[in-house]
Amino acid sequence: MNPDYHYLFKLLLIGDSGVGKSCLLLRFADDTYSESFISTIGVDFKIRTIELNGKTIKLQIWDTAGQERFRTITSSYYRGAHGIIVVYDVTDKLTFENVRQWLQEIDRFACENVNKLLVGNKSDLVAKKVVDFNTAKAFADSLQIPFLETSAKQSTNVEQAFMTMATEIKNRLTASQPTQTVDKNKVVPGSSAPISPKSGCC
């Protein structure tokens, strides 16, 4: 039986508590937004299927808690991730400064070749913005990772952020698979096996 998708990508949303990770996930997966803030406890995930260059891609997006006390819980979810979106709040400089710490978490727990994306959320709060776009862009460029500013509230660049990540992952996997050789740790065309949170590197 043929699966209803060509690829299954596991994505993670990480970053300090309160930067809007859950809001980004809800906006992308369900096209909803809530002003009320409830901290994520541990992890949660949603699935959305997209079309990209004629291929059907199922995105399994994990929303992780930003609080320190959940780090040991969420660290296991880095393994097997194809892409990780690091989110900060453009109105909170500390959350941007802590991006380096989150990147260290990725280096420690995730696969070496995992795709990364830097996202500055809450771009609609122009009057409260303290992290300059060019500063964040220069930082991302120095790490050779894509960067976007988003607004989950206004749905600005949210779709583009996840599509950018999916495109980057697909390009990497396609480039690393010139043949149809199946690697159990990679998601290849026609693969219907679900991704385990404890699976190996991709």
Curated annotation (Swiss-Prot):
Chief location category: membrane
Covalent S-S links between cysteines: none
The UniProt record lists the keyword Membrane: yes
TM regions (residue ranges): none
CDD domains: Rab1_Ypt1 (cd01869)
SUPFAM superfamilies to which the protein is assigned, alphabetical: P-loop containing nucleoside triphosphate hydrolases (SSF52540)
Record localization: Cell membrane
PROSITE patterns cross-referenced by the UniProt entry: RAB (PS51419)
Sequence motif: Effector region, positions: 37-45
A GO cellular component entry from the record: pathogen-containing vacuole
SMART domains, per the entry: RAB, RAN, RAS, RHO
Keyword tags: Cell membrane, GTP-binding, Lipoprotein, Membrane, Nucleotide-binding, Prenylation
Positions of S-geranylgeranyl cysteine lipidation: 201-202
KW GTP-binding (keyword) present: yes
Binding of GTP, residues: 15-23, 33-40, 63-67, 121-124, 151-153
Entry-linked InterPro entries: P-loop_NTPase, Rab, Small_GTP-bd, Small_GTPase
Pfam hit, one: Ras
GO BP annotation list: hypotonic response; intracellular protein transport; Rab protein signal transduction
Bilayer topology: Lipid-anchor
Ranges where the record places region Disordered: 180-202
Molecular function as annotated in GO: GTP binding; GTPase activity; protein serine/threonine kinase activator activity
Gene3D superfamilies hit by this protein: P-loop containing nucleotide triphosphate hydrolases
Family statement: Belongs to the small GTPase superfamily. Rab family.
Protein name from the UniProt record: Ras-related protein Rab-1A
Organism: Dictyostelium discoideum
